Amino acid sequence: TLMALVVAVLFALVVAACGGTSGGGDGEDSGGDGGGGEDAAVDLPECPVDALENVTAADPVEVTVWHSYVAKTQQALEDLAAQYNDSQDRVVVRVESQGNSYSELQRKYQQAIPSGDLPGIAILEDTQNQSMADSGTVIPLDSCDAADDSFDTEDFLPIALDYYAIDDVVWPVSMNLSTPILYYNRKHFEQAGLDPDNPPTTLAEMRDAAQAIADANIPGIEAPWVQVSNPSFVESWMTGAGVELVNNGNGRDEPATAATIDGNEQLLDLFNYLNDMVDDGLLNPLPDTEGQIDQYTAMATQRSSMAIETTTAATSIEAFLKGQLDTSQLSSDGRINVEGLDLAGLDIDAAPLPGVEEPGRPQVGGGVYYITNTTPPEVQAAAWDFVKFINSTESQVFNNLQGSYMPLLESAVDDPELKATWEDTLSGQWLALGFNQLQTGVDPEAPGITLGPYTEFRDELGTALEDMYFNDGDPADVLGQAQANIDEAITRYQEENF
């Protein structure tokens, strides 16, 4: 129950928020074919890694980290900062929450750009990568890699570098990785005559399972599938099927100049599928509002049997079920309340993301670390030193086990504690599921969209979903309107230099 609620809140942070406006720049460095490396860091901002050499314990450098995490994910970040502070005496890292959603954090970051009053590090949502690169306010990973002989990216997951590369330059200095998976109620599957060990693998099978659950007339179920109208899931379904949503190779061959939504047969088929599911009472769509948790309450109270969310909340879910989670962080409106919930009777499991054609084909998601270039050199160097700590195998293992993010390093999966957790605990098995999707399910040649006005793109795609669900919009019409609005946003981004 609570588990589901927690997942919802954390996932809302991961995928629901695209932030405020995009950053500056002319959009000419969008695109890229993955990778990154020192050869690309020729005309990039410098990373003053040596500026920390003259700093002493008597006058340590302070680095502020902005984030928008909650629950176990927030605690993991705070614990890592404390561990780093205890490990040395020249840098003090201070972790500051800027709200409970990526969009709120992004707005604050954008508002601070004119004054330059930015933190040393900002952990922003993955869709901000192009606009952050264009903003002129951050130092790319490749610059720090080239300047620091003690560091390399050989151990990084290749798909992470591929996804975040723009013209072969990787801008985030660290990546908190997550992917969407299917959460489902095993007891409901059994009651409907379904095999709980063989959950749906495709959207067609999702409909079959939902119909079987509906036909079983299980007491209390209002709709077999509850789902937030989150456009990132649409992106995952389309990316997994090899369908582009903006032109020029999803903006990776060269800067995208238009969306490819209107007249996109595969996307229209998906919208028609979802619309039919709602019309037939098999899917309960929810508005994609900040802090949305109703999908979790539906799962917690067993009013629904299935939901698609990310791996990010796995540890929070488990902690919630065990009564070890401080739920006061998650909601101020009283909607998260464990009293009266049948936690013992809630049997939740997870499976790879059901796809259009095959399972486990998601799009990369999560939060990413950026080092700003508006602070003094010694602060930039101190921020890099902390990031190197975050990028260590030990920290990546800790962040996975405590914060539910996928490890960025391939070496992390060989850690004995991580191995045992992934094999022996419920949350660990879900995390292993997500990691496997990252390794095998994302096409490195087509990992997803890169776009300056990605915020506007996702907002318009989400609006199209909600207009169809809640305003009786015709699928073709809402997609046509989304196309027009996205094209305007792309043109405006190019003309106004952000």
Mark where each language-model region is.
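Extracytoplasmic/periplasmic solute-binding protein
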Residues: 166-175, 180, 204-259, 266, ...
